[in-house]
Regions:
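Ligand-binding "clamshell"
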Residues: 1-6, 114-126
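A ligand-binding cleft/hinge motif common to bilobed small-molecule-binding domains
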Residues: 98-121
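Solvent-exposed loop/turn segments at secondary-structure junctions
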Residues: 24-26, 44, 52-56, 110-113, ...
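Extracellular/periplasmic bilobal clamshell ligand-binding domains
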Residues: 178-209
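Periplasmic-binding protein-like
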Residues: 14, 44-51, 75-80, 86-87, 118-144, 156-177
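A bilobed periplasmic-binding-protein/Venus flytrap-type ligand-binding module shared by bacterial periplasmic
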Residues: 17-24, 134-149, 165
Length: 209
């Protein structure tokens, strides 16, 4: 974004979550790692959004950086071989798992919150070392024609009472940035971007067959 935006800010965060249908799975029987999603035990029982877009893409690319290419490619191919349900978005993952059409799903914390507000039988599995925190970001485009209005908005969304409302309504997990001990805080994002074209080519070939 260098040279494109100015006044780039980070505030608060959501997170990726692995969810389960609590009517169908005891939490003690749930996977201990997202690497287990390729196990035959979970064949045709896992849902996730297309890994080419949005937070799912961010998470999947971060896993490549964390695990290395060989393990990551094998895991992605394993998801396909295990007949993972690839759907149009994170909210659809919540609906499928809530309805029992899938037993497990990768989604976002705010989508899970919506499902819980609808009394769906859902819970998340604490796998912080494998689940990507998603800081909120806001920025103004360089030479924006309405820079004063843009700056007013940037300041507004970071006001303490606005952040408190976002947390209260589960749009954010916290008004603060993710804790430093979160494994994905140390991910080398320039490395991810350097391999982005190659990574997306692999994902298209793997998931869009």
């Amino acid at each position: 974004v260098a040279g494109i935006v100015v006044d780039f800010e980070e505030f608060g965060y959501r997170s990726r979550v692995l969810i389960v249908n609590t009517n169908r799975i005891e939490l003690s029987e749930a996977p201990k790692s997202i690497k287990d999603l390729v196990s035959r035990k979970w064949k045709n029982k896992v849902a996730m959004a297309y890994p080419l877009f949005g937070t799912t893409a961010t998470h999947i690319l971060a896993l490549k950086e964390a695990w290395g290419s060989e393990i990551w490619e094998s895991w992605c191919e394993g998801l396909v071989a295990n007949k993972t349900k690839i759907v149009d978005g994170n909210s659809m993952v919540v609906r499928l798992v809530g309805a029992g059409e899938a037993l497990l799903g990768l989604t976002d914390s705010d989508d899970l919150a919506v499902g819980l507000s609808q009394q769906l039988p859902l819970a998340s599995i604490p796998l912080e070392n494998e689940l990507c925190a998603i800081p909120n970001t806001v920025a103004m485009v360089k030479d924006a024609p309405h820079s004063e209005g843009a700056m007013s908005f940037i300041n507004y969304v970071q006001r303490e009472e606005i952040l408190a409302d976002l947390v209260e309504n589960s749009a954010l997990i916290s008004a603060k940035l993710p804790p430093e001990e979160n494994a994905f805080q140390s991910i080398f994002w320039p490395g991810i971007l350097a391999e982005e074209k190659e990574s997306f080519s692999f994902l298209r070939d793997t998931f869009l067959r």
